[in-house]
C-alpha cells in the first residue's frame, strides 16, 4: 500500500510540474496577448522594459499609439493600440527568432513548404519591397479566417519580378530557389 501511495505522490508531482512548464511556455505566444490591455500586459511581462509612443502606421495613413516590449533585443515585440488609453490591441507583431512564438506551430524561420503543410493548403504570397511585402494569403486553408498574418522573405536577393504590390505567380522551382521563410508574424484583432 505504501508503494502505491508513493507512486501516486510521485506521479502527481511530475504531472503538476509538467503543467507549470506548459503554462510558462504559453506565456510567450502571440495569442497570450490577445484581448489584454496595457496594464495587464505590464503585469504579465514586468521585465519587458516597454517603450511607448505614437507613429504613422499602415503605409503612413493612420497614427496609432504603440508599445514595444523588450526593445532592441531578439525578443522585441510591437503592439499597436486602437485607442490612446491602450485598452484594446489593434495588432501585435514580431520579426526576430526570440522567445515569442505562435500556438499554431508557425514561428520565425518556418519554411514555405512547412507553412503550406501547417495550413493544409499551399499558401500564396505578395511581392517583396513594400510595407506588406511577402504577405501570405492562406488560400482557403486552415488559417483563412484566423487573425494570424504571416510574412515571408527570400534568403538572398530575389529577381525583380518578385517585387511589388501584387500576388506572385511562381513555379515550384522558383519558390524553392527563393528559399522563403517566415520573417514576421502578426496578430490583428
Where is each model-derived feature located?
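Sec-dependent N-terminal signal peptides
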Residues: 4-13
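Long, compositionally biased
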Residues: 140-159
